[in-house]
Every structure is written in structure tokens, then in C-alpha cells.
Amino acid sequence: MLKINYFNDTDVNMNSWKKFANKILKIAYNYFNFNYDIELSITFVDDLKAQQINQQYRNHSYIADVTSFPVEMTENEIKAIGFRELGDMFINLSEAKRKAIKYNHDLNSEMGFLFVHGFLHLLGYDHENLDDEKIMFDLQDQILKLNNLVYIIKFNEEDYLESN
């Protein structure tokens, strides 16, 4: 079972995005065939909070669209509490809207990408080098396709960081 705890630190009603995340992440959860329950939190944040989190914990000054903080657990810890706590994901709808316009994506694809991308980071996947990037982005594409979403990355992260 997948349990998602939601928090909303914005002035926007996020109920439709919660339903969307539930659908997408349930498919992602089933894709991995976990033999234990998973719990994670998603907090919707505004630009200011997204930038503060990114500055404080990542030492980057740009406004992030998604930031993830995984929790590492041993098999014994998972068995002891009966589920695996994945960690916390912070999603910035305002930045997602800007990126959807900038890269000509529809907002559902952009948000679907952010939910899956953040989920994979919580599972320990990363894109710090080309080999890891290929693994993570291939998984991301497969899960998005299972959700009937297509997301084409039209920039590389270094270019994005330099422009912000």
C-alpha cells in the first residue's frame, strides 16, 4: 500500500493535484512491486518557500519546481515499523506552470513529471552522472507512459542552473 501525506503551504486549492499525484504514484508504486508498504509526504509550496528550501538544503538560489529529501532505512527498520518511509517531496505549482509554458508542455505532463521525478529521487535514483541519469530518466519515461503522459526534457540541468 502507498500512503501519501499532503501539506499545502500555498493559497491555492491543491485537491485536484492530490488526486492526480495519487493516481500517478500508485502506478509508480505498483511498477516497482514492493513487498512492503510505503509512506511519503508531499508539500505544495510557493516560490519563496521553494527558493528558501533550495538555498538552505541544496545551496542553490534558484526557485525549484521539485525538491526531494529521501529517508534511508534498513530492512530491519522497515520490518520493525511495518512500512518504508520514503521521505519528503516539495512541489512548486507556480514554477511548474512557468516551465510548462517555457518548454511547451501541458501542465498535467509537467506535474506528472515532477511527481515521478521526485518519487524516484526518494527511492535513491539520481542524475549526477550520465549512467545514473540514463537509468533514472528511462524509469521516469516508463512510469509516465504507464500514465499516458509524455515528457520530453528540452534542457540539461547545467544550462538551467546557469540561467537562474
Swiss-Prot record:
Q: Which domain of life does the UniProt lineage start with? A: Bacteria
Top enzyme category? hydrolase
Amino acids binding Zn(2+): 117, 121, 127
The protein's location, in the record's own words, is: Cytoplasm
Report keywords, A-Z.
Cytoplasm, Endonuclease, Hydrolase, Metal-binding, Nuclease, Ribosome biogenesis, rRNA processing, Zinc
Biological role stated in the UniProt entry = Single strand-specific metallo-endoribonuclease involved in late-stage 70S ribosome quality control and in maturation of the 3' terminus of the 16S rRNA.
Q: Which PANTHER family match?
A: ENDORIBONUCLEASE YBEY, CHLOROPLASTIC
Names of required cofactors: Zn(2+)
According to its UniProt record, which protein family does this protein belong to?
Answer: Belongs to the endoribonuclease YbeY family.
Q: How is the cofactor bound?
A: Binds 1 zinc ion.
Q: Which organism is it from?
A: Mycoplasma capricolum subsp. capricolum (strain California kid / ATCC 27343 / NCTC 10154)
Which GO biological process annotations does it have?
rRNA processing
Gene responsible for this protein? ybeY
Please state what the protein is called. Answer: Endoribonuclease YbeY
PROSITE patterns assigned: UPF0054
GO MF annotations in UniProt: metalloendopeptidase activity; RNA endonuclease activity; zinc ion binding
**Which cellular component terms (GO) are annotated to the entry?**
cytoplasm
Q: Which cystines does this chain contain? A: none
Query: What is the E.C. number?
Result: 3.1.-.-
Gene3D superfamilies named among the record's database cross-references:
Metalloproteases ('zincins'), catalytic domain
